């Protein structure tokens, strides 16, 4: 009995101080996508790109997974299945107030498990390439590497005029 009370008490304390893991679920929330992207100007400074991501969040071509904490969406991911064997992580973003809590990793792990369970073998993601020196995107590349992605190739003029790094993760 004591250990159950202790565990229950620990959960209540975690909830009280806001460190409970978020709920990860499939949900479309274009408004939350816009809100989170607008709060990350180092990565999403182009209003047109934010408009496009907001539209993608409403598009059934994309699977939208969100992280919810105390009723608020604090993280978003959009994936698109190109072929049965492969998918693209089109967007992942976490509210800056929730960064460092493992939300991004939880979203990617959830997406990867869902895709793997559906027969997908490979997940790709595009980000600004290392030949364009930019500290926020250096953090993004390190995050992707830490979550199991490996660099495949870098191209210019793919998603923007500069270099794009394509990373892949075996599922």
Feature-to-residue mapping (PLM):
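A short, internal acetyl-CoA/4′-phosphopantetheine-binding micro-motif in the GNAT/acyltransferase core
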Residues: 92-99, 129-131
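Acetyl-CoA-dependent GNAT
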Residues: 24-91, 95, 108-109, 114, ...
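Conserved N-terminal entry element of GNAT/NAT acetyltransferase domains
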Residues: 1-28, 171
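Conserved GNAT acetyl-CoA-binding A-motif
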Residues: 115-136
């Amino acid at each position: 009995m004591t250990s159950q009370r202790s565990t229950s008490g620990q959960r209540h304390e975690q909830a009280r101080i806001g460190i409970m893991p978020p709920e990860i679920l499939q949900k479309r929330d274009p408004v939350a996508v816009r809100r989170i992207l607008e709060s990350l100007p180092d990565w999403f400074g182009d209003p047109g790109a934010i408009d496009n991501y907001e539209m993608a969040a409403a598009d059934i071509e994309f699977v939208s997974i969100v992280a919810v904490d105390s009723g608020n969406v604090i993280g978003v991911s959009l994936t698109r299945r190109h072929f049965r064997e492969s998918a693209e992580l089109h967007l992942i973003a976490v509210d800056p107030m929730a960064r460092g809590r493992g939300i991004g990793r939880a979203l990617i792990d959830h997406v990867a498990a869902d895709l793997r369970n559906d027969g997908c073998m490979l997940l790709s993601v595009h980000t600004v390439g290392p030949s364009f020196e930019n500290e926020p995107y250096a953090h993004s590349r390190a995050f992707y590497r830490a979550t199991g992605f490996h660099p495949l190739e870098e191209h210019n003029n793919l998603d923007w005029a500069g270099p794009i790094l394509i990373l892949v993760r075996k599922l």
